[in-house]
Amino acid sequence: MAARLRHIALCVKDIDATADFYEQAFGMKRTKKHEGKTAWSVYMSDGEVNLALLQYKGEEGSGVPKGWTGIHHFGFQCDDLPAQQKQIEKAGGQFFFDLGEPEDEGF
């Protein structure tokens, strides 16, 4: 089965204000809130599109400079991650992290 877009993750400065905005402006619902070692996260959905709002506590684990905002990553769901990685690399893409177990951040 082909990979499917699962979510778009945004780095934000004020996670609660941003979640409030997406609720009020687009009718999205908060589906989960999580505090990990390096970031707070709020997951939102309108039933079709999913957003992951990320507010990092510092630069550790974020991959971006402190205070940076914008698209952090796109999350895809697939049935066979090692096979998908090979397909991505064959198409000219690259992985920035090794495959492993999900971390405490909820990913």
What residue ranges belong to the model's regions?
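Vicinal oxygen chelate
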Residues: 1, 4-13, 42-45, 63-107
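Short secondary-structure boundary micro-motifs
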Residues: 26-29, 58-60, 77, 94-97
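A short, acidic/glycine-rich surface segment
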Residues: 39, 53, 58-64, 97-98, ...
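Short acidic, gly/pro-rich beta-turn/loop elements at beta-sheet edges
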Residues: 20, 52-54, 63, 85-86
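Core segments of cupin and vicinal oxygen chelate
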Residues: 2, 9-51, 103-105
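A short, local hydrophobic-aromatic micro-motif
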Residues: 6, 31, 72, 96-97
